[in-house]
C-alpha cells in the first residue's frame, strides 16, 4: 500500500472516529455507534506502534462491551470483541499470554456463532481462530514482533534460506491478512450502517 493511500485511510478512519465520538456525546445509548467506534479504533490501531495499537485495541474492547451492556444480543459487537482479542494476541510475543487472548477470541466467536449460526463471517472467524496460535508461533519465529504495524518491509533478495522459509512467511501473512480483513469488514459494515438513510415516519 502506498503512503498516500495509507494516509487517506487514516484520515477516513479518524473522521469516522470523531463522528462516533460526537454521536456518543449526544446519544450515549446508541449500541450501533459504539460498535462503529470500536471498529474504527481497531482499524486505526494498524497504523500505530505496537504499544499504542494494544492500547487502542483495549479501548475498542471497552466500546464493544459498552454496546453489549445496551444491547446484550448485539452479535456484531460480540464478533468484534473476538477480532479485537485476536489482534491483541498477534501483537503479543509471549505465547502463553497470546494463547489466553486467542482463547478469549474463541469464546466470543462461538457466542457470535450461537447468536447467528448461518453467518459465514462468524463461522470462518471461529474456524480461523483455532489455527491462530500456530500462525502466531510461526509469525514470531520469523520476526513479526519487531515490525511496525501497518508497514511491510521491502523483501530481501532471494536466497536459499528465503525460499526455505517461504511457507513460514506465507503463514505470517495469512495471519495478519486475516486480522486486517476482519477489522476492515467490521469498519465497512459499521460505516455502511452509519450512512443508511432514515426513512421519514408515515
Curated annotation (Swiss-Prot):
Listed transmembrane segments: 175-192
Entry keyword set:
Acetylation, Membrane, Mitochondrion, Mitochondrion outer membrane, Protein transport, Repeat, TPR repeat, Transmembrane, Transmembrane helix, Transport
> When this gene is knocked out, what is seen?
No visible phenotype. Triple mutants tom20-2-tom20-3-tom20-4 are vible but display a slightly delayed flowering time.
Q: Where in the cell is it found?
A: Mitochondrion outer membrane
Question: Where would one find coiled-coil regions in this protein?
Answer: none
Membrane topology reported for the UniProt record: Single-pass membrane protein
Cytoplasmic-side positions: 1-174
| This protein's name | Mitochondrial import receptor subunit TOM20-3
The source organism is Arabidopsis thaliana
Gene encoding this polypeptide? TOM20-3
